[in-house]
Amino acid sequence: MRADPASWLIYNPPISMAATHKALMELIRGIHNIKPRHRGCVLTIGNFDGVHQGHHAVLARLQEKAVQLELPACVMLFEPQPLELFAGSAAPARLSRLREKYEALKGMQIDRMLCVRFNQRFAEQSPNSFIEQLLVEKLGVRYLVVGDDFRFGKGREGDFHLLEEAGHRFGFEVISTQSFQLERQRVSSTLVREALKAGRMAEVEMMLGRPYTISGRVAHGDKLGRTIGFPTANLALKRQVIPVGGVFAVEVLCSGKTFPGVANVGVRPTVHGTQARLEVHLFDFSGDLYGQQVKVLLRHKLREEQKFASFTALKEQIERDALAARAWFGLPLLNLPSTLLEKKGTQD
């Protein structure tokens, strides 16, 4: 049975996506692109992977202070994420690409996003150098909001107390936000990944404040789907590791419209695929999506990806998946293969 989305969203920050927001958020790519006009801001720092409800709490505090001080609200994040530099392919799967972080943040009344290149040289600078050269000299930070677990500088030696001391010396205020909790659990990117892996999509949606979304440009595939009555839009997953896999009931956002469908996220082992991709079939849709930018919202997990003994067996399972997804959305059983409807009638 389909869950009630209204029951999931128990936290509604004042900077929600539905709120009126600034038309444009400035993207500053690299420390070398910080200009004198960028001095003077309220700032928060982090990975913002997934831009989840815990991040929302930090951003709400940031925006509140930006209004009070009449200063720009700025988010500093890192590319690659620090663990991707230190751990390589062993780093946790990303929830969001940089573009997806930008899209999420620009709807939250943030004025600037500073993307810092995280390389070995940057990682080895001392905490004091980070504070004095970047926060004070270049950004002129007046107010800093960080999570209660924030660490920085070589060996992660910098912490909230060091920032507080620096604030007293250089004249900026530092606030530590307490971790946002749902059902007594600290909301974190790690917790979101665990729920995604387990297929608990309602829980994921509750922690993110929205459905988990994969975005990208529709590319040409091998067109196997159309040979069995299920043409698909294909998105290459340009990530070292993907955080989610399997078959899902989805909604696809394209050109201001929303279409329900069914999608597979994975390597397609039955047809000897090797690279992860997202293949989505839109219900009752006719049109050409090639080259278009789309967002795929993963609403409900149907099953894990699996390898079938034959292409015929795969086709039959795809038919069952489509039937299950339509049922989850409460859609009529139209435009399904007659053989599948006959099987359903027999089973009933």
Task: State where each predicted segment sits.
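N-terminal catalytic cores of NTP/NDP-binding nucleotidyl/phosphoryl-transfer enzymes
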Residues: 35-97
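Phosphate/ribose-recognition catalytic cores of enzymes acting on nucleotide-derived substrates
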Residues: 15, 221-348
